[in-house]
């Protein structure tokens, strides 16, 4: 009895999870003609637009379906013929009246006579257990038309029972889930699982990346094992993580309804499908049901040379701070990606000196085999006449949004050759490190060129051929961040000379906290507490910063106990570092609060040390989903001369992080200028000042203001006060391209690009007469982000273009008056006002040229401000720059 009950339950559950019928898929009755209506429509908008604001189009028709053959040995093996007739094309959703691009146009005029004939030729489907085994059509039909037929054919693929399986249809090989109910089946396609060959790429860093969501749901209403209605809806939505106003949405709908059935032709006899197909028409060929790539030919578009001529003025040096320069740069990159090597090389060779650097930025950023060949043919690394162009090429390589192995291989080949400039040789190796990291992030760590590059970097540190090459390989490792390089970094950090030791600790500072193990911290603690040798303040404070990323109780306790025993300015610096961690609630703050509960650690004498060095972190912007932070720390020598200033900007979105910029100015050995005594461990340092920068996670080659006492004096005597440029150029920062095969047969495309023109410069001024020094770091940028979303049927196209642009600036000024002790220090961070402009263009366009366009724009002004630092700094600035008394305008003598 129990066994019977179990069998009954199994039978009942099977029955309730499937639609009534004897087949596993759709089944047609013999000698019946099924007459249906079919429509596919598509809507595009900017993501949050109202339906009535969308653009798009609708293709509708009648559809005739007949059963041509059924396998005598099984009902689930059949061949059906599907014929599209009475085609019409119109606006989707709202009617535009006279503004409609279809107004007064017949279907043959819109689609084209040949296209319409191809669309209305019958197609054959071989269905086995409800799935399309073969799709038969005629050879050499236009791809766009074939895809529309594939979109309709895919609707006939379904099963009548619940379950999850993999299916091949127009979208590719996809995971599909069926939910069967009484006379109804819901089919959910997991679009993110679809395997289909399509071109595309995206930016690896999530902060600069694109978030997307795709859904596909098809509902079948079934009667007598055939459909009475099919409703399919596919949605594709995206948004740029960094700028949520850059967004788009595509909604594609299909509708198939049974209107009537009537007497149809007799079935074709036979046991073999091949014979049946041949009997219908020998010209039928089996072709893939997976959507094919629709290549778009640009009619009447300008040549590359004509395009360059039209935008060249925008890329002249004096115009680079404007958004128009970046907009032209982005548009030209798109054209370069479809151009041949010869065309690109011709423009490079013909261009004049002042615009060539910007052209090199664009050609390198195109990242195609042709553009790479052209730029490598053009540049001569053995010549010192094009050093600026060589450096711009290398920086563009470092910022590459989707580098490939070929680019890395090209730089490795160049590194093995000879150079006119040692600076360029160093830059090549530093950028090789950046490419290694990007390729590894994209699962390319085992590529042959990556393995070779890693071996070169690590080998250069293990056994450098020349002592001066050590810095170069450390900078390369600072970009590559290879875990296997950590033991070498610890060796150089502890045993290396001052500048090398400091650089090695700054490299460790860039590693993720998971790599800062107890073994690493053991070495860093020895450096900070000087257990084996005396280290410079810059080395010790950097070692402490790495330890405080993830400190143990004893790490924190020993660092806090050291405050009060350190050199004067280092005391103050470490004190403000701890206060900054607590103020900004950094990960180490909880451990520090625990340790501060000990009376021996937390006492007034330790935490009341005077000095001018400082560390401070604050927010530039903050929202529930994103934050932008700035941090500024300055370390002085005991005599009041700048030792190091470090300005950082980070962008966070969720758990993703982007090191937007870092500008470090370092100086040493300058005490002799004011007859001051150097700090412990820094008595024999050569006079030096220089600047180092990280930009968008890429370490650039440092620049030197002066090196050595004689160089310092000559620079002081001949100083013009002009800033030294650290990096200047056009950068492609956001780069997302995606071809999408919609299940309706239409082709969609998403292009999102973001670029900027950037100029980071720095200067250091001394006045022995006024006993004052000034340090300036100036950032100027123009940013443009564009997106273009299109849906193309080959004869009609709809699209939404969005653009956001701004011009902004950030300046840091540090003024030190060292005529007394404690010396006076004033730090200022000024954010310039920034205009923000947003544009949106929606359009519909026929291949014949007729179009509809809708435009919107929005402008606002973000006010400038002075970013706040700590209270002590504000008080000091009031002393350095006392408020001016109001002038008396009475006009009298008394």
Swiss-Prot record:
Coiled coil: none
PANTHER family: MICROSOMAL TRIGLYCERIDE TRANSFER PROTEIN LARGE SUBUNIT, MICROSOMAL TRIGLYCERIDE TRANSFER PROTEIN, LARGE SUBUNIT
Disulfide bond annotation, renumbered to this chain: 174-194
The protein's name: Microsomal triglyceride transfer protein large subunit
Cellular component aspect of the GO annotation: basolateral plasma membrane; brush border membrane; cytosol; endoplasmic reticulum; Golgi apparatus; microvillus membrane; receptor complex; vesicle
Leader sequence segment: 1-21
Primary role: Catalyzes the transport of triglyceride, cholesteryl ester, and phospholipid between phospholipid surfaces. Required for the assembly and secretion of plasma lipoproteins that contain apolipoprotein B. May be involved in regulating cholesteryl ester biosynthesis in cells that produce lipoproteins.
UniProt GO molecular function: apolipoprotein binding; ceramide 1-phosphate transfer activity; cholesterol transfer activity; lipid binding; lipid transporter activity; phosphatidylcholine transfer activity; phosphatidylethanolamine transfer activity; phospholipid transfer activity
Species of provenance: Mus musculus
Recorded catalytic activity of this chain's protein: a 1,2-diacyl-sn-glycero-3-phosphocholine(in) = a 1,2-diacyl-sn-glycero-3-phosphocholine(out); a 1,2-diacyl-sn-glycero-3-phosphoethanolamine(in) = a 1,2-diacyl-sn-glycero-3-phosphoethanolamine(out); a cholesterol ester(in) = a cholesterol ester(out); a triacyl-sn-glycerol(in) = a triacyl-sn-glycerol(out)
GO biological process: cholesterol homeostasis; cholesterol metabolic process; circadian rhythm; establishment of localization in cell; lipid metabolic process; lipoprotein metabolic process; lipoprotein transport; low-density lipoprotein particle remodeling
Subcellular location(s) per record: Endoplasmic reticulum
């Amino acid at each position: 009895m129990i066994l019977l009950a179990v069998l009954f339950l199994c039978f009942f559950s099977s029955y309730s999870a499937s639609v009534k019928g004897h087949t596993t898929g759709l089944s047609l009755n013999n000698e019946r003609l099924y007459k249906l209506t079919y429509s596919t429509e598509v809507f595009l908008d900017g993501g949050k637009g109202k339906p009535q604001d969308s653009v798009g189009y609708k293709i509708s028709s009648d559809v005739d379906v007949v059963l041509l053959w059924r396998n005598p040995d099984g009902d689930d093996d059949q061949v059906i013929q599907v014929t599209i007739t009475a085609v019409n094309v119109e606006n989707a959703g709202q009617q535009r009246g006279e503004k409609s691009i279809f107004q007064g146009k017949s279907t043959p005029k819109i689609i084209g006579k040949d296209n319409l004939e191809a669309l209305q030729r019958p197609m054959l489907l071989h269905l086995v257990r409800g799935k399309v085994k073969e799709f038969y059509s005629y050879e050499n039909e236009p791809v766009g038309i074939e895809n529309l037929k594939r979109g309709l054919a895919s609707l006939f693929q379904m099963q009548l029972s619940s379950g999850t399986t993999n299916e091949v249809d127009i979208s590719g090989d996809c995971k599909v889930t069926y939910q069967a109910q009484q006379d109804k089946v819901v089919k959910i396609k997991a679009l993110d699982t679809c395997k289909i060959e399509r071109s595309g790429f995206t930016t690896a860093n999530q902060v600069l990346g694109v978030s997307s969501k795709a859904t596909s749901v098809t509902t079948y209403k079934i009667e007598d094992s055939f459909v009475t209605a099919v409703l399919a809806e596919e949605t594709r939505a995206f948004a740029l993580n960094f700028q949520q106003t850059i967004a788009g949405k595509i909604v594609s709908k299909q509708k198939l309804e049974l209107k009537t059935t009537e007497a149809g032709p007799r079935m074709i006899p036979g046991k073999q499908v091949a014979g049946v197909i041949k009997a219908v028409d020998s010209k039928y060929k089996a072709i893939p049901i997976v959507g094919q790539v629709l290549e778009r030919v640009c009619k009447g578009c300008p040549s590359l040379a004509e395009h360059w001529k039209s935008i060249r003025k925008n890329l002249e040096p004096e115009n680079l701070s404007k958004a128009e320069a970046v907009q032209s740069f982005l548009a030209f990159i798109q054209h370069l990606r479809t151009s041949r090597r010869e065309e690109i090389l011709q423009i490079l060779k013909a261009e004049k000196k002042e615009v060539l650097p910007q052209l090199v930025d664009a050609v390198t950023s195109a990242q195609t085999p042709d553009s790479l060949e052209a730029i490598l043919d053009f540049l001569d690394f053995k010549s010192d006449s094009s050093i600026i162009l060589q450096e711009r090429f290398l920086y563009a390589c470092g910022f590459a949004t989707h580098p490939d192995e070929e680019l890395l291989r090209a730089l490795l080949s160049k590194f093995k050759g000879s150079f006119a400039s040692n600076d360029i040789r160093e830059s090549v190796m530093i950028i090789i490190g950046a490419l290694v990291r990007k390729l590894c992030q994209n699962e390319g760590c085992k590529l042959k060129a990556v393995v070779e590059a890693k071996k070169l970097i690590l080998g250069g540190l293990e056994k450098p051929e020349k002592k001066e090459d050590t810095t170069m390989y450390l900078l390369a490792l600072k970009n590559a961040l290879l875990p296997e390089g950590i033991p070498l970094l610890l060796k150089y950090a502890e045993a290396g000379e001052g500048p090398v030791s400091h650089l090695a600790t700054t490299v460790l500072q860039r590693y993720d906290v998971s790599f800062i193990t107890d073994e690493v911290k053991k070495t860093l603690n020895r450096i900070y507490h000087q257990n084996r040798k005396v280290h410079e303040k810059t080395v010790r404070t950097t070692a402490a910063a790495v330890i405080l990323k993830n400190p143990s109780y004893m790490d924190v306790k020993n660092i806090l106990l050291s405050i009060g025993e350190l050199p004067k300015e280092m005391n103050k610096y470490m004190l403000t570092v701890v206060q900054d961690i607590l103020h900004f609630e950094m990960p180490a703050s909880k451990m520090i609060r625990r340790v501060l509960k000990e009376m021996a650690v937390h006492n007034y004498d330790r935490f009341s040390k005077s000095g001018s060095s400082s560390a401070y972190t604050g927010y530039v912007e903050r929202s529930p989903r994103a934050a932008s932070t700035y941090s500024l720390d300055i370390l002085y020598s005991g005599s009041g001369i700048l030792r190091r200033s470090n300005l950082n900007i980070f962008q966070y979105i969720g758990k993703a992080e982007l090191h937007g910029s870092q500008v470090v100015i370092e100086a040493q050995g300058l005490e002799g200028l004011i007859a001051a005594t150097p700090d412990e461990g820094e008595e024999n340092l050569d006079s030096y000042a220089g600047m180092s920068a990280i930009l968008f996670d890429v370490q650039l080659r440092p620049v030197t203001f002066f090196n050595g006492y004689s160089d310092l004096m000559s620079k002081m005597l001949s100083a013009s006060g002009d800033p030294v440029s650290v990096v200047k150029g056009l950068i492609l920062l956001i780069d997302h391209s995606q071809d999408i095969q919609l299940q309706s047969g239409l082709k969609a495309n998403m292009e999102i690009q973001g670029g900027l023109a950037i100029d980071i410069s720095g200067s250091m001024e001394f006045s022995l007469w006024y006993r004052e020094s000034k340090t300036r770091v100036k950032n100027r940028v123009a940013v443009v982000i564009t997106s273009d979303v299109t849906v193309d049927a080959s004869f009609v196209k709809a699209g939404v273009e969005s653009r956001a642009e701004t011009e902004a600036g950030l300046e840091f000024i540090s003024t030190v008056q060292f005529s007394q002790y404690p010396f006076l220090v004033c730090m200022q961070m000024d954010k310039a006002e920034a205009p923000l402009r947003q544009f949106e263009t929606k359009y519909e366009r026929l291949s014949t040229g007729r179009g509809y366009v809708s435009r919107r724009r929005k402008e606002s002004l973000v006010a400038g401000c002075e970013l706040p630092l700590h209270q002590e700094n504000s008080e000091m600035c009031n002393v350095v720059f006392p408020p001016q008394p109001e002038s008396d305008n009475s006009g009298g003598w008394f």
